[in-house]
Design a protein with these regions (language model features):
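Beta1/beta-strand and adjacent pyrophosphate-binding region of the FAD-binding site
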Residues: 27-38
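Conserved beta-strand-loop-beta-strand element in the redox core of flavoprotein oxidoreductases
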Residues: 136-157
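Aromatic pocket-lining residues of Rossmann-like dinucleotide-binding sites
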Residues: 48
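Conserved N-terminal/central alpha/beta ligand/cofactor-binding core
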Residues: 53-54, 59-141, 181, 189-191
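Extracytoplasmic
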Residues: 531-676
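Flavin (FAD/FMN)-binding glycine-rich loop and adjacent Rossmann-like elements that form
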Residues: 151-162, 166-530
Length: 676
């Protein structure tokens, strides 16, 4: 009977719906072992399988998709055109779920469902609840890894030809003996300006917030969350880590809402700084003051940090990257309790302004999310942990276009972004006050290529390991790269590269990168289908315009900019499909809002007074078709212009004309999507 109970206690439910024994005998040698079931890990596994390799996917937890399925539903990406391949397909499938061509905001359970679907379609069973115990190497090659259950029992050996580390922590990379960095480099190390210590003004306390338990009395001690460390000069390197938090999915729908209850160990003194912050200036509402709300479908949220004291637990994660599993579990639990207490404090502490308490009490945990983790996210936002120091280190110069690479295998498109790393006492005009340090938000540059060499270690260290998440980058460059869509792109790259290394019988550092680039470009879904053609208004080779057009770089544009005409004079823009392959295509035109907006379909901003009648001419190389669209509808969405057959050697195009409308007309991007 004891043997039977022991057996049953170690069964877990695999994503395909089959029961899978966690302590099964060692698996046969597989081609590719992916460690980490993050969004990158799923795409890496699927990519390797689609190009013909046997794959095993190992995930330390019990959920798939990482942060994409853990609450980050407001996709962080500066330029949607940078998202390619399986990553773009993911957001297309999200769109299909919600009745659009593609969508960049979604509910957590929908994301996890889609990741499971990808694995099911590929015939991959993820092995969950299996964390890394050790790595076996022969020379510069990993020969096997040993994983164990979360309680440290039932070790299992897994052998593979190639390994991919898709964990947020870089555990496989570290155990394989690969050089890595933790913390922030000094600016001098890579000739950067935004690395190291940065005392700036974003997510900052107002002047004069007293740091002591008893105001003006240092002997009373510091308030909770303030470190005793001294502020170093700007640009100084250190071992601090940008803050982690939970991206919170809440709902205001009473039928689907569970109240935010007082958490275990609740201590209101942990939020005393919030009261002192509010005493300096009482906010009118929660969003953009105490937190940042972004609405998801079905009355749900993705809530992020915003302000001096918010959901970021600054300073509580500095030992996380190299910590033991037990210590990491403590850190994760501390973040969970802090977050629950933060929301409870706002809604229930009588010292909080009543209008903020009332607003907070509108929100609660959704009944239909995270049903096996008490309706609270299963994934802490590990913004940064270890970073590999590989064959090539991405730096600020890459972000700004001052250094370029020829082996690019994916694009990054976000600002150089770091959340705060420390909360300290500083003096200003002789007065001690609390300050957050480390937040950087520097943009103004376009998409830039990520070097393949940043995904592989130095040759002497390991020749069969690819690291697409904890890749080789400085702290500030990593802050631009570290977005979930980019991780998916790099995961796909890693899967294809691992397969190619097997086929070429080479170290991952020595594969034909040109061949890898061609595969990703010409077969982006890895299924042999024709690649789509996306023509953006900034494509000078394919786009011509007549009349007066203003190029705007703000708003909900699809790429870097959008064209706007509204002077009442005739004007037109032609999007030519030069180089398109023959076949049947469904053609779409993107319809952005002129200002603001987060790119959510149907979202309308204060300047949505666009033209109601815009003339469209579609020429597929043989048939010329005219139609009229209303740009006041389907905001931030793709407008379907119908199906068209493109013949070999023809030159199709889509032309948009203003017809002299005094209302603003926008011209952004045209998509030629193959019909399967």
């Amino acid at each position: 009977m004891k043997t039977l109970l022991f057996f049953l206690s170690f069964l877990f439910f695999a994503p395909t719906g089959r029961f899978f024994p966690a302590f099964s005998p060692p698996v046969p040698v597989v081609d590719v072992c992916v460690y980490g079931g993050t969004s990158a890990g799923v795409m890496a596994a699927v990519a390797a399988k689609r190009v013909g390799k046997s794959v095993i996917l190992i995930e330390p937890g019990k959920h798939l998709g990482g942060l994409t399925a853990g609450g980050l539903g407001a996709t962080d990406i500066g330029n949607k055109m940078a998202v390619t391949g399986l990553a773009r397909d993911f957001y297309r499938r999200i769109g299909t779920h919600y009745g659009h061509l593609e969508q960049w905001t979604f509910e957590p359970h929908v994301a996890e469902m889609l990741f499971k679907t990808y694995l099911r379609e590929a015939g991959i069973t993820a092995q969950l609840n299996s964390r890394l115990r050790s790595v076996q190497k022969r020379g510069s090659q990993i020969s096997a890894i040993v994983v164990e259950q979360a309680n440290g029992t039932t070790p299992q050996t897994i052998r593979a030809k190639q390994f991919i580390d898709c964990s947020y922590e870089g555990d496989l990379m570290a155990m394989a003996g690969v050089t890595f960095a933790v913390g922030r480099e000094a600016n001098s190390q890579y000739a950067e300006a935004w690395n190291g210590v940065q005392l700036l003004d974003k997510h900052q306390f107002p002047d004069g917030v007293d740091p002591y338990r008893i105001p003006s009395k240092p002997e009373s001690g510091l308030l909770y969350g303030i470190e005793k460390a001294k502020l170093n000069p700007n640009g100084t390197g250190d071992q601090t880590i940008q803050a982690y938090n939970y991206r919170m999915c809440l709902t205001d729908q009473p039928a689907n809402r569970l109240p935010i209850m007082r958490p275990d160990g609740y201590d209101s003194t942990k939020y005393e700084l919030l009261l002192r912050q509010i005493q300096k200036k009482v906010p009118n509402e929660l969003t953009w003051n105490l937190m940042h709300f972004v609405m998801m479908p079905n009355h749900k949220t993705d809530i992020n940090n915003c302000g001096g004291l918010s959901t970021d637990m600054i300073g509580a994660n500095h030992d996380y990257p190299n910590a033991s599993y037990a210590r990491r579990a403590e850190i994760i639990r501390d973040h969970e309790l802090y977050t629950k207490g933060f929301f409870y404090f706002i809604g229930h502490d009588p010292r909080m302004p009543k209008h903020l308490r009332d607003e907070m009490l509108r929100w609660g945990y959704p009944k239909d999310e995270y049903v096996d983790t008490d309706h609270f996210s299963h994934q802490l936002y590990i913004r940064e942990a270890r970073r590999m120091v590989g064959e090539y280190v991405m730096t600020q110069a890459n972000c700004e276009g001052k250094a370029t690479v020829t082996d690019g295998i994916g694009m990054a498109a976000y600002t150089m972004d770091s959340h705060n790393c420390q909360r300290l006492v500083v003096e200003k005009d002789g007065v001690a006050m609390v300050r957050n340090e480390g937040d950087v938000q520097v943009g103004g540059f376009g998409p830039y290529p990520i070097s393949y060499r940043a995904l592989v270690s130095k040759t002497a260290e390991c020749t069969n390991l690819i690291v697409p998440v904890c890749l080789s980058a400085s702290h500030i460059a990593y802050g631009s790269i570290r977005m979930e869509p980019v991780f998916m792109v790099l995961g796909q790259t890693a899967g294809v590269a691992a397969a190619q290394a097997i086929n070429e019988d080479k170290a991952v550092q020595g594969i034909d990168v040109g061949r890898l680039q061609r595969t990703l470009r010409e077969n982006p879904l890895l299924d042999g289908s024709h690649p789509e053609l996306l023509v953006d208004n900034d494509d000078s080779l394919r786009v011509t315009r007549q009349g007066n057009w203003q190029r705007l770089t703000k708003g909900s544009k699809y790429g870097t900019s959008v064209l706007v005409s509204g002077d009442g004079q005739p004007a037109s823009v032609r999007f030519a499909a030069a180089g398109i392959k023959p076949g049947r295509y469904r053609i779409y035109m993107y319809n952005p809002t002129r200002a603001g907006g987060g790119g959510n379909p149907d979202q309308v901003d204060l300047q949505s007074d666009k033209a109601e009648r815009v003339q469209i001419r579609v020429f597929d190389g043989k048939v010329d078709k005219s139609l009229t669209i209303n740009q006041q509808r389907q905001n931030n969405d793709w407008i379907n212009l119908g199906e068209h057959v493109v013949m070999a050697g023809k030159a199709p195009y889509v032309e948009l004309a203003t017809a002299g409308s005094p209302q603003p007309t926008v011209a952004d991007a045209v998509l030629f999507l193959p019909v399967k």
